[in-house]
Amino acid sequence: MAQRIFTLIFLLWTAVGTPQVAASSFGQKLFGNSTTSRFLPVDGAFAFEFQQQGNQLNLRWDIHPDYYLYRAQIKIEGNGATLGKVELPQGESHNDEFFGQVFILRDRLALAVPIEQAESGATVKVTYQGCADAGFCYPPETRTVPLSQVLATANTDSPINTLSGQTAPPQTTPMPFSPWWALLIGIGVAFTPCVLPMYPLIASLVLGRKEQLTPRRTLLLSMTYVQGMALTYTLLGLIVAAAGLRFQAALQHPYILIGLSVMFIALALSMFGLYTLQLPSSVQTRLTEWSNRQQGGSVTGVFCMGALAGLICSPCTTAPLSAILLYIAQSGNMLAGGGTLYLYALGMGLPLILVTLFGNKLLPRSGPWMQYVKEAFGFIILALPVFLLERILGEAWGIRLWSALGIAFFGWALMLTLSSKKGWMRGVQLLLLAGVVISAKPLQDWVFPPTGTAQTHTSALNFAPVANIADLNSALAKSPQPVMLDLYADWCVACKEFEKYTFSDPAVQNHLSRITLLQADVTANREEQNALLKKLQVLGLPTIVFFDTQGKEIPGSRVTGFMNAEQFQAHLQKFSP
């Protein structure tokens, strides 16, 4: 009797439970297992760790094989903290059909973030994004890292490794150019029309005496004059860098960077002759009188003359000097600030040393070429706002700005050579023309994108937009047909491949004509979009979700990763009416 009761219970359970299980199993077999399992969750693909060691924050990603991070999408921002410069590895070049040449990072990524100052409760926001080689891309991932308090002291440039007890090398903010470039800039400024003709006069004032001096004495006096001038410039560099270090956090603000860029552009325009920048004439006259009172020929007098000469800025030196000072202030690097200005002054003084030793015969003849040197420095100064604006506008716009600057410089140089009759100049003109063409390539690709490059999101299908969970629920409730929800983002390469190769296929479009089409664009990564992705349990893109007429997701029908037109059509035939 008991055995019969047990058999009856078993048959009832089978009758009730088996259809559901069977239906689910049938759906799995019919549509194939959900392809979500093909891809790892974001924490499995990019395992992220962090550790603060004194005033250094160490970030680490363990990147799973066949996955990669986009170098340009790694962003680190401090909240209540001032962070130093973070150097990212170059990565490997990756040619993408839709985004062009990009750099990606594989295997492992370790970054050391200098913390110059951190308030109590400060945090660091770390954003990163990556994809799988199979074409599956993850939304931008943001992690908030808490920081321990770090006081802004003179020792904050030397992070202490609390694990080993060893002091790491000082962390400084690197400048875009080596300070040694300042030496070449100083030499170049010496050959501008406001400076070069003055060297014979300055040489006579430095030597002072009419009797013949020994070469050693002449070299000593000229070097003393240059060192006096260099001292003034070095002190200016140290003062400005110290001020910049104190207000470095404010100087990183976008509005400040834009203001500095405008000032650099104004300084560059003065080098092109649009207007003149110099000290007020009354101040220059007084400084000149003080300089003339010094006794030429004596070491002390010549040193004072050089120190005062460093304050007398001619129209040709004001703009380059101001540009260097502004950039030093923005970098906040005292060592580089003082050294850069010293080398700049030394470069300006080298022609003077040669004139005092060998006379005027070593100086080139004056001519229009000196004005060309001055204008060339205008282009050099224009490079500085590009460096600053690139931080705000991003890498893509930075390349376009460099492109525009390259076109302007090579075009200007080409125009200067057109009047030359010399045969060898034709080769120079060809090189300059090639420079114009190469520089124009990024702008050309932006204005006239190559075939296959999508500048705006356009679809071959007529999707109804869905912005959030409420929109999706409303659309599902109203639709008398099955529903296909396409989750799209501009940063998703495979999403663009779906648009170009799959949704444009006539057979696919014919099947989809009997289905309500919805699309959620999650490019902006807003909170409501993230909530939608979380509700649908979407790991990454592309993801396409199918719902039945009751608004329920059809088991096993979800698509993750790219499918070509033939594969997608076969998938649709399994459940489309």
Curated annotation (Swiss-Prot):
It catalyses: [protein]-dithiol + NAD(+) = [protein]-disulfide + NADH + H(+); [protein]-dithiol + NADP(+) = [protein]-disulfide + NADPH + H(+). The chain crosses the membrane at residues 182-202, 225-245, 255-275, 308-328, 338-358, 369-389, 396-416. The keyword Electron transport applies. Residues 1-23 form the signal peptide. It is a multi-pass membrane protein. PROSITE patterns: THIOREDOXIN_1 (PS00194), THIOREDOXIN_2 (PS51352). Keywords: Cell inner membrane, Cell membrane, Cytochrome c-type biogenesis, Disulfide bond, Electron transport, Membrane, NAD, Oxidoreductase, Redox-active center, Signal, Transmembrane, Transmembrane helix, Transport. Pfam families: DsbD_N, DsbD_TM, Thioredoxin_2. It is found in: Cell inner membrane. Residues 437-577 form the Thioredoxin domain. Disulfide bonds join C131-C137, C194-C316, C492-C495. GO terms for molecular function: electron transfer activity; protein-disulfide reductase [NAD(P)H] activity. One of its GO terms (biological process) is cell redox homeostasis. PANTHER family: THIOL:DISULFIDE INTERCHANGE PROTEIN DSBD (PTHR32234:SF0). Required to facilitate the formation of correct disulfide bonds in some periplasmic proteins and for the assembly of the periplasmic c-type cytochromes. Acts by transferring electrons from cytoplasmic thioredoxin to the periplasm. This transfer involves a cascade of disulfide bond formation and reduction steps. HAMAP family: DbsD (MF_00399). Belongs to the thioredoxin family. DsbD subfamily. This is Thiol:disulfide interchange protein DsbD. It comes from Pectobacterium atrosepticum (strain SCRI 1043 / ATCC BAA-672) (Erwinia carotovora subsp. atroseptica). The lineage of its organism: Bacteria, Pseudomonadati, Pseudomonadota, Gammaproteobacteria, Enterobacterales. The gene is dsbD.
